[in-house]
UniProtKB/Swiss-Prot annotation:
Gene: engB
Pfam families registered for this protein in UniProt: MMR_HSR1
Family of this protein: Belongs to the TRAFAC class TrmE-Era-EngA-EngB-Septin-like GTPase superfamily. EngB GTPase family.
Keywords associated with the record: Cell cycle, Cell division, GTP-binding, Magnesium, Metal-binding, Nucleotide-binding, Septation
Domain annotation EngB-type G: ranges: 23-194
Names of required cofactors: Mg(2+)
Species lineage: Bacteria, Thermotogati, Thermotogota, Thermotogae, Thermotogales
Protein name listed in UniProt: Probable GTP-binding protein EngB
Binding annotation for Mg(2+): 38, 59
Protein task: Necessary for normal cell division and for the maintenance of normal septation.
A GO term for molecular function: metal ion binding
InterPro entries hit by this protein: G_ENGB_dom, GTP-bd, GTP-bd_ribosome_bio_YsxC, P-loop_NTPase, Small_GTP-bd
Organism: Thermosipho africanus (strain TCF52B)
Length: 194
């Protein structure tokens, strides 16, 4: 898959903000704060489209990136970051819930990014169960895999495959080594991204 053009077309800050026109589907990137969503989007597009930071909570809005004038990459705010205000966390939750309920019909695949160094967190589990209830297809992207020793890595991959691997794709991924990028492109093509 080759990404020829990328354009940020809409940023959603509030649940009543208007969504962009629909295209040939949406590929959603969601996960805890500081798990690497923005870095992954930058790698996939070959451009610095999403702001990155070592400090969690950088993405505070829903960002719609038009890819090849055909479909969207949708970058959702990270969840689970304790150092933002209760009001800000509530706003993020509301716009994320609103997005999934209003745009589920146009979502091709949700990439759920999970820090592969750790077992499933409660917030991640709640999200995955909710995506199942909404009958949305998702793939689990295990981030930061380059930080694990081979034995730890094999253990964590086995852990996630035991939990979700029978029905969902598990992708070990590293921003450093680029492991997993080809699999993500392949899924985008399979699910209709051209």
């Amino acid at each position: 898959m080759k990404i020829k053009s990328v354009e940020l077309v809409k940023t959603i800050y509030k649940s009543n903000d208007k969504y962009p026109e629909s295209l040939n589907g949406e590929f959603v990137f969601v996960g805890r704060s500081n798990v690497g969503k923005s870095t992954l989007l930058n790698i996939l597009t070959g451009r610095n489209i999403a702001k990155t930071s070592k400090k969690p909570g950088k993405t505070a809005s829903i960002n719609f990136y038009k890819i090849n004038n055909s479909f969207y990459f949708v970058d959702l705010p990270g969840y689970g970051y304790a150092k933002v205000s209760v009001e800000e966390r509530a706003r993020w939750r509301k716009i994320i819930e609103n997005y999934f309920s209003k745009r589920a019909w146009n979502i091709k695949l949700v990439f759920v990014l999970i820090d592969g160094r750790h077992e499933l967190q409660k917030n991640d589990e709640i999200l995955l169960e909710w995506l199942k209830e909404l009958e949305l297809d998702f793939a689990i992207v295990m981030t930061k895999m380059d930080k694990l020793k081979n034995s730890e890595r094999a253990k964590m991959i086995r852990y996630y495959k035991d939990l979700y691997g029978e029905n969902y794709t598990i992708i070990p991924y590293s921003a450093i080594t680029r492991e997993g990028i080809d699999k993500i492109y392949e899924l985008i093509e399979i699910f209709g991204g051209v």
